[in-house]
C-alpha cells in the first residue's frame, strides 16, 4: 500500500480486573527494506529497544524495574516505502505515568545524544549472528524461499544486506534514527485497569 503517515493519538482503554497494563505505540515510516538507510535503521532500532540488551530494556525493566517487558520492533515494507516502527511495555497499571516517562526519556536521550561506537558494533554483531542462525533453521529457509519467489528476489539480496549491516557507522545509525523516529508522530494506546 502507498505510504500514509500515522495520525498521532493517545487512547486509553479500560480493562477492568486485569493485573497487567500494556502500552503500545507505533508510527509508519516512508522506508522500504531497499532504502539505503534501512540497514542503519535496523541497527538503530535494535539499540533502542529491539533486544534484551537494548537501552529501553536495560533502563525501564532492568534499572528502574517498572515493566515486565519493554521494547521496540521494526516491520519493514517489502513492496513499497511503508514500514512500521513500534514500541511496547507491559507493566502494573499503577506504574503508567512512570513507564511513559521512562520510555519517552530513553527515546529523547537517543535522539539527542545518539549512540556510541561500541553500541553500534555490538548491535551489528548481534544482528548478523541472528541472521546467520536463522538461515540454519528449516522453517526460516522455507519461509524465505516463498518470500523471495513472491518478491522476485534471490539469496544475493540477503548477502547484500549482511554486508550493509556490517558496514553501518555510528553516524549512519544516529542519522537514521533521527530521520525516522519522530516522537510527536507516535500513535499510543494504553490498556489496563487504571480506574482502581
Question: Each predicted region: which residue ranges?
Answer:
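M16 family metallopeptidases and their MPP-like homologs
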Residues: 20-32, 57-167, 183-192
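Generic structural marker for isolated residues within well-ordered, non-membrane alpha-helices
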Residues: 41, 57, 174
